[in-house]
UniProtKB/Swiss-Prot annotation:
<feature type="region of interest" description="Disordered">
    <location>
        <begin position="131"/>
        <end position="179"/>
    </location>
</feature>
<dbReference type="InterPro" id="IPR010897">
    <property type="entry name" value="Spore_II_P"/>
</dbReference>
<protein>
    <recommendedName>
        <fullName>Stage II sporulation protein P</fullName>
    </recommendedName>
</protein>
<keyword id="KW-0749">Sporulation</keyword>
<feature type="compositionally biased region" description="Basic and acidic residues">
    <location>
        <begin position="168"/>
        <end position="179"/>
    </location>
</feature>
<dbReference type="GO" id="GO:0030435">
    <property type="term" value="P:sporulation resulting in formation of a cellular spore"/>
</dbReference>
<feature type="compositionally biased region" description="Basic and acidic residues">
    <location>
        <begin position="146"/>
        <end position="160"/>
    </location>
</feature>
<dbReference type="Pfam" id="PF07454">
    <property type="entry name" value="SpoIIP"/>
</dbReference>
Length: 401
């Protein structure tokens, strides 16, 4: 009997010790929480964690992480995950969050160490066929000697393409915006040109011209939109000339094109979309696609990461990219965002939530390839536009009822 009582006393003593430890840990936890709360509330506002901070962390996480978190709570999500998405590398994720090094993006190893490397810090939001971090759209300012002496334009090439465009059979559009000009096309880097437009020129850095340049593509795109019943205005303000007169460098181009866009928005209440046309600096193998046996200049969409309208403009660009992939596979190189330190990162896209920046082809593409690209881009844009008009009309009728 005495042995049994001793055993019971020992058990009680052990249980009592666990309870004391639990209470102690609880009190310590409360103290830590109060101390952390005091530290966080005493920090200066700019040092406190904010929703933006957590958004930035979440932005770094790949989508499959969130999919797996949902799967842990609801196993039905597992059926929608492909075999390749069935697991993610925790070690890679930890490395990326701790060091900002992405093993799939070699730029992250040296991006903060090399001066000027941030200019190439473009993010792929949606990749087109064959697009990766080694062949993204690139833009480079013109050498000073290009601005000092004008290259001779290949007028025969330009006249030939314009004649073919004028003689092309065009059916009247089934629907139209009437007299309303709903699209405004402009060219921030208006001197960007293409080597086939310049006589005897082979140096890609010299692909610049005051007349034979990307504004010709703006004309093509505007005319193609008109043929789809969408009223478009093509603005050819010489931004480079304005920079030269004011003694400003090339990086200030958007400062000079901004008033052009503001004036357009203020003077035309029917305006719905503003589109900035550019040319890529890459070579032909990256900027050309063969679709049904015909050669096209590829199209890239760039969204300003620093713009307050980033989400809305990205939605439009992604919709156009997906339509292109469906109707013209390989035409779109993808949707990209830019907004690194030292980069403009806005591109006038803060002025409206329907702003686009399109890059048509690269330095080696000819007018025939560019014309096909402009026609295709207008085709998918018109499909998106008229579908949206139907939805708006239907919602308007519903409100009336």
């Amino acid at each position: 009997m005495r042995n049994k009582r001793r055993n019971r006393q020992i058990v009680v003593a052990v249980n009592g010790g666990k309870a004391v430890k639990a209470i102690f840990l609880f009190i310590v936890s409360l103290i830590v929480i109060f101390v952390l709360s005091g530290v966080l509330t005493s920090l200066r506002p700019e040092l406190r964690p904010s929703s933006d901070s957590f958004y930035g962390i979440a932005e770094e996480l790949p989508g499959d992480v969130f999919a797996h978190l949902l799967q842990m709570e609801n196993h039905y999500f597992a059926s929608d995950l492909s075999q390749t998405d069935s697991s993610f590398h925790l070690s890679r994720l930890s490395l990326k969050l701790a060091t900002s090094i992405n093993l799939e993006d070699p730029r992250s190893f040296l991006g903060r160490e090399l001066p000027g490397f941030a200019q190439f810090d473009t993010e792929i939001l949606l990749a087109g066929q064959g697009t990766d971090y080694t062949n993204m759209p690139a833009e480079s300012p013109p050498p000073s000697k290009v601005m000092e002496e004008e290259r001779e334009a290949n007028l025969a090439e330009i006249e030939k393409q314009q004649t073919q465009s004028d003689n092309a059979q065009k059916d009247p559009p089934k629907q139209t915006t009437g007299d309303k000009k709903v699209v405004f096309i402009y060219h921030t880097h208006n001197t960007e040109s293409y080597l086939p437009l310049l006589k005897g020129e082979t140096d890609p850095d010299m692909a610049r011209h005051s007349k034979a340049n990307v504004t010709l593509v703006g004309d093509m795109f505007g005319q193609a939109l008109e043929s789809q019943g969408i009223g478009a205005t093509v603005n050819k303000t010489d931004i480079q000339s304005k920079l030269n007169k004011k003694g400003l460098n090339y990086a200030r181009s958007y400062d000079e094109s901004r008033p052009v866009v503001k004036d357009a928005l203020a003077s035309n209440k029917n305006l719905q979309y503003i589109i900035d046309i550019h040319r890529d600096s890459r070579r032909k193998k990256d900027t050309t696609a063969t679709i049904k046996g015909k050669s096209y200049a590829r199209v890239a969409f760039v969204v300003g990461k620093k713009s307050k309208n980033f989400e809305e403009n990205y939605k439009i660009a992604s919709e156009l990219h997906k339509l292109m992939e469906k109707k013209y596979p390989g035409l779109s190189t993808g949707v990209f965002s830019k907004g690194s330190p030292g980069d403009n990162g806005v591109y006038n896209q803060d002025l409206t939530d329907r702003a686009l920046l399109l890059e048509f082809g690269g330095v080696d593409n000819n007018l025939e390839e560019l014309q096909r690209a402009a026609n295709a881009a207008a085709d998918v844009f018109s499909e998106m536009y008229w579908d949206a008009e139907k939805v708006n009309a239907a919602s308007g009728e519903t409100k009336k009822q």
